[in-house]
């Protein structure tokens, strides 16, 4: 389990190879290689972001997330609710080491209501190291370590009950 008591995200259980795989339709969403924002836009008229928390934090405030990022004096933390047609679809938490916030990527601290995916996937220098699949009761989650010009950031996404991920008929939360 992972969780930060100050986070908008509840504790998440990250699944290992021993866990049963996600249903194929759900896995298709969770393993999405492109922008989740763009994928959501295909299922609604309007996607928008409501920032919940944006601030610098220290490594000891990250909990187990620190294992996925290099040591840094500070990390930029951004927590948001992403909505499709005014329905909350996703909770997002981004942790960015100070060293990633250089040059044009310093703009990451000023995204405000701009979806992170719009910024990240406009870069020719974006790569993804991995996607981990997780659960929180009946809800699905994913965690990705991404790199901008080789510099890391960690993105955790929890798909809320109204998310189109569950509209496939597979693993619809109650």
Curated annotation (Swiss-Prot):
Q: Which residues bind substrate?
A: 36, 78, 116, 157
What's in the keyword line of the UniProt record? Cytoplasm, Lyase, Pyruvate, Ubiquinone biosynthesis
Enzyme kind, highest EC tier: lyase
Q: Which reaction does it catalyse?
A: chorismate = 4-hydroxybenzoate + pyruvate
Pathway membership of this protein?
Cofactor biosynthesis; ubiquinone biosynthesis
Recorded name of the encoding gene = ubiC
Q: Which organism is it from?
A: Serratia proteamaculans (strain 568)
Q: What does the UniProt record say this protein does?
A: Removes the pyruvyl group from chorismate, with concomitant aromatization of the ring, to provide 4-hydroxybenzoate (4HB) for the ubiquinone pathway.
Which protein, by its recorded name, is this?
Chorismate pyruvate-lyase
UniProt-listed GO biological process terms: pyruvate biosynthetic process; ubiquinone biosynthetic process
